[in-house]
């Protein structure tokens, strides 16, 4: 009997390979705001006329929202970074779970569906696993506007039972300035009968961008970006053309990329007052930041020292940049403290950063960081969108090579990230499933013998 040698093959899942320790240079281009684009796309359901949204980033979240709108009966035409939406023939009031479970912004459709069709059935939404983000404030706001809302088997069922099928204006006070709840109430009240006020609303730039587009459609929204928003309901809204604001979170990520690689960079386009808290902390930790032309910022890192931050709603330090800033603090001189006050499960990057040589101690939602001279390349994994960005920044600054898995998270919020970073001088490339026998990849390698087992467990 002849013996047959068995070769065990290993597979690396789709990943980024990063050669760290290289300075960046030039310009990092900022795309349109993802979070703004998603709300604007949902708002297109409010009118029977065509609506053109420009400067929309190419992201998987945008693709999911596009599919949701098509499922409702809307017609979409995409050209480069523009999307034309025609919602004249929407007819479906129920969203499928397979689309909604991965995108929290899908819940934005509830208000427009109520105003257009008088009914909506939407499964409780998903998104990044960063802690509880209940839709209670959304539901309470819709109820205040006269909608009948109930949650049955994790499906939100809402309808308008008034004789004319219109919601009714109301005075609403949010317990917490939730961005999503503010946007839901804002869209639902535009076509309501009478006057609506939202006290303690979210003041984020994305709220202001939504209000600006709604007003260009014929809505009457006043006070977006302040502590009280007033909406005077109108009979109908028209189509319009609107350009999405620059993504302040991507811009902040790029500013931190410059700081962590100790590289002078130009970042833009940006709206500086959307980044005031971030710019302030970067200056405090040792960066020079100045206006460069009308729409760009120039950042020059000098000597990075530890500073403390606490996340809070706008205009405070954004929770979406907590993780990237922690990567920077991991390489800063001295100690720092980062407190997360918006979400209770947003420290998934700490373990991966420590794997790269960072010295971070986590106590509840506060991270205590002792800066190290340098991070070391490693095999690392992102657990959500912003932790993935933080880990990529760490890989850029680290000594040696890194393999990053978790592209499904990164692709949700950063358009063509590796292409932009490559243009700025980094060595970073996207790789797909590969066969390898290198032991250095061991903690990210999946044995073919165990693939089915792991799929079943997931």
Curated annotation (Swiss-Prot):
Binding-site residues, UDP-N-acetyl-alpha-D-glucosamine: 104, 320, 342
Predominant place of localization: cytoplasm
Binding positions for phosphoenolpyruvate per the UniProt entry: 34-35
EC annotation from Swiss-Prot or TrEMBL: 2.5.1.7
One term of GO molecular function: UDP-N-acetylglucosamine 1-carboxyvinyltransferase activity
Keyword flag Cell division: yes
BP-aspect Gene Ontology terms: cell division; cell wall organization; peptidoglycan biosynthetic process; regulation of cell shape; UDP-N-acetylgalactosamine biosynthetic process
InterPro entries membership: Enolpyruvate_Tfrase_dom, Enolpyruvate_Tfrase_sf, MurA_subfamily, RNA3'P_cycl/enolpyr_Trfase_a/b, UDP_GlcNAc_COvinyl_MurA
GO CC aspect terms: cytoplasm
Keywords linked to the UniProt accession: Cell cycle, Cell division, Cell shape, Cell wall biogenesis/degradation, Cytoplasm, Peptidoglycan synthesis, Pyruvate, Transferase
2-(S-cysteinyl)pyruvic acid O-phosphothioketal modifications at: 128
Active site: 128 (proton donor)
Catalysis: reaction(s): phosphoenolpyruvate + UDP-N-acetyl-alpha-D-glucosamine = UDP-N-acetyl-3-O-(1-carboxyvinyl)-alpha-D-glucosamine + phosphate
Subcellular locations according to the entry: Cytoplasm
Pathway: Cell wall biogenesis; peptidoglycan biosynthesis
HAMAP family in the record: MurA (MF_00111)
Family as reported in the entry's similarity comment: Belongs to the EPSP synthase family. MurA subfamily.
NCBIfam families for this protein: murA (TIGR01072), PRK09369.1 (NF006873)
Biological role: Cell wall formation. Adds enolpyruvyl to UDP-N-acetylglucosamine.
Protein name (database record): UDP-N-acetylglucosamine 1-carboxyvinyltransferase
Lineage, uppermost ranks: Bacteria, Bacillati, Cyanobacteriota, Cyanophyceae, Synechococcales
Gene giving rise to this polypeptide: murA
